[in-house]
Design a protein with these regions (language model features):
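Phosphate-binding loop that captures ATP/GTP phosphates
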Residues: 27-80
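Cytoplasmic membrane-interface segments at the C-terminal ends of transmembrane helices
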Residues: 27-28, 49, 53-59, 87, ...
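Flexible loop/N-cap segments at domain edges
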Residues: 67-69, 75-85, 92-102, 115
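Short, basic, glycine/proline-bearing loop/turn elements
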Residues: 84-87, 138-139
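Walker A/P-loop phosphate-binding motif and the immediately C-terminal alpha-helix
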Residues: 2-37, 104
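Conserved catalytic-core segment of NTP-binding enzymes
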Residues: 99-106, 110-185
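Glycine-rich, Arg-bearing micro-motifs that act as flexible, cationic patches
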Residues: 87-93, 119-124
Length: 185
């Protein structure tokens, strides 16, 4: 399970998650891409206004978490996307959120999950915590930007690795980011 997250909006988390899923598909792996941030349909050029993760979490008497794959949209390039959905996280049933977290953490299939910005996400902690903490790859997506990195010391969660979005003209580099984060770039 690959979980992509950031500490600042606009860091590129959605693009990195999409890239990971599409790269896996090119290698013959058919990952399930799960959008908890809401931007993946637009990035991938597919319709995402239908039911998704939040709708499943809000359906009190709905089917089990294995049915989530039935909500997947085929994406050109060989991956499948479960969109965020049309319900808000505030409508989610606590038991369904916990069941989803358990299902995803125990899944044997290839997963790429876009959590988005941890600082502003409305994803329930009962889902967010297990995903970030138990991910095979917990990937902090950041730019070599002081504003992005200054939030890290206050963050309880630590990534297993960093996806550094490189931009010309930045004063910070790879070694600076590794030193601050304490994880490989």
């Amino acid at each position: 399970m690959n979980v992509c997250w950031s500490l600042k909006g606009g860091s590129g988390t959605t693009v990195v998650a999409a890239g990971l899923a599409l790269a896996a598909a090119r290698r013959g792996i058919r990952p399930l891409l799960i959008d908890l941030a809401g931007d993946l349909p637009a990035v991938l050029g597919v319709e995402g206004a239908g039911p998704g993760v939040t709708d499943w979490c809000s359906a009190a008497d709905g089917p089990g978490p294995e049915a989530l794959e039935q909500l997947a949209i085929e994406v050109p390039g060989g991956t499948r996307l479960v969109a965020l959905g049309t319900s808000g996280w505030h409508d989610a049933e606590a038991e369904r959120v916990a069941a989803l977290a358990g299902h995803l953490v125990q899944s044997d299939g290839p997963l790429v999950i876009d959590v988005g910005n941890l600082g502003t996400t409305s994803v329930p902690e009962a889902l967010l915590g297990p995903l970030v903490e138990r991910a095979t790859r917990s990937i902090l997506v950041t730019r070599a930007c002081y504003l992005s990195l200054r939030k890290l010391p206050a963050q309880v969660r630590r990534p297993t690795e960093v996806a550094l979005v490189v931009e010309p003209g930045r004063a910070l580099g790879r070694t600076d980011v590794e030193a601050v984060v304490g994880s490989p770039v």
